[in-house]
Regions:
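Flavin-dependent oxidoreductase catalytic core characteristic
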Residues: 1-216
């Protein structure tokens, strides 16, 4: 216990509120995938169709898309592939486990983390592209070099995280040839281009230091 007359009372109370928020976030994290799969099974959401299309793509010869020279072209491709990774893992888990998936909480958490990182990556990408278009040229980085750098850093970091979540989820429910195929798919869909992250982080930090505050 603690005394309400003590200044520490406010700190204890605020800390307790933060724990409530964190608990709610964890519950929502578990419910994210469960809700998507339930809607898919009820026919309210076409999840299996795209998932099967991704599975068919894995069985085919990898295509060699034309290079996208537009602003953040590589990152656009990466985000599109993140979505394929989510569909592959979620669809595979749903087909293998069915309604039993609800009992596999670690697998659900890995898929939920994939969904969350993919959502954030796309949000960051679209926000940066919108800023560029507001400047009158969606292909220009003039005046927003740091924003582009932060977008690249986030999406490239997300690729490693999503790959990790995908591998752990697949290893939890698949085996044999299916496991090998899905692990190869995870590696393929989470592939990132070579990026000098040290220089990009220095670029962002230099701007913040010069401004003396968070300036984005």
């Amino acid at each position: 216990g603690y005394s309400a007359e003590s200044p520490v009372e406010r700190a204890y109370r605020d800390s307790r509120i933060n724990r409530i928020f964190e608990g709610t976030n964890e519950i929502n994290r578990m419910l994210t995938v469960d809700m998507l799969l339930k809607r898919a099974m009820k026919g309210q959401l076409d999840l299996m169709g795209p998932a099967q299309a991704v599975a068919a793509e894995l069985m085919g010869i990898p295509d060699m898309p034309e290079p996208d020279d537009s602003l953040l072209g590589d990152e656009k491709r990466m985000v599109a592939n993140f979505k394929k990774a989510v569909l592959m893992v979620a669809g595979g888990a749903a087909q293998k486990l069915g309604l039993e998936l609800a009992k596999h909480q670690e697998t659900l958490m890995h898929i939920a983390d994939m969904v969350i990182d993919t959502y954030l990556a796309e949000s960051v990408l679209l926000r940066t592209l919108k800023l560029a278009s507001m400047k009158g040229d969606s292909g220009s980085v003039a005046g927003m070099t740091e924003q582009v750098a932060m977008t690249q850093l986030y999406i490239h970091d997300a690729a490693d995280r999503i790959h990790k979540y995908a591998k752990e989820a697949v290893n939890n429910f698949a085996d044999g040839d299916e496991q090998r195929a899905m692990l190869m798919g995870a590696k393929r869909f989470c592939k990132s281009t070579n990026l000098n992250t040290a220089e990009l982080r220095k670029l962002v930090a230099k701007k913040v230091i010069a401004e003396g505050k968070y300036c984005y």
